[in-house]
Amino acid sequence: SDIASIAAICHAHNVPLLVDEAHGAHYLPFAARYGWQGGAVAAGADLVVQSAHKTLPSLTQTAFLQLNGGLADPDEVERQLDVFETSSPSYPLLVSLDGCTDWLAADGPAAFARWRDRLERFSAAVADLHNIKVMCFGQDALADHPDFFAHDSGKILLQIGAEGAAFLRAGGFEPEMVCGPNVLAMTSPCDNTHALDRLAEVLHHWDDSPSRIAPAPPAHLLPAPGNATCTIAEALLRPARQISMTMA
């Protein structure tokens, strides 16, 4: 999303902008020199929620709330947090966030430099794939997609379909998302040194596999939507029973 333009519109009306940047905790000031420019904070959002556990070394369910600029009153934010947050926080989760920030301060730039090196090595390793498209890696470049508004090179989009995703799982990799032909692989600055090398090897095996099936085009994923017979709220609150897809 064009957060900078959205922020400008909000600020023109003296309205603070809150952004849920779940997958963007790695968009830190020092990360720009390693290829991660931008992010909601740099774009001028006033409050940004970042899920630290997705791309940084922190336990699941941990997140940062970043305050940025002058429209968000820190005292009011703290008051609202007292209202909506639990009065019995998980101290292991809080310690995990403290450990994450300590790690970023001590080793963050070096870790991000190693992350960039691993991604570049991965890109070179998949350049000779013949049947698999790896978006913006290998033979496919970001310049080939002028319509892309932005690109996070830490996320690897593979067009290998559900069968390819199953092959990845058999090779020890759990995809973040599988949707039609697209399979999303998440990386982070905390990955094992050779994790992306192994991912490239698994992709080469799938590329050469006689059981490889070309993923279905997106148009074949879902049928055309029919007419709605009730609202989402009615569907949620009315009595219901489970039936098979063939009966739906």
Where are these regions (language model features)?
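Conserved PLP-enzyme active-site core in the AAT-like
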Residues: S1-C136
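Conserved C-terminal alpha-helix-loop-beta "cap" of PLP-dependent enzymes
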Residues: A124-A248
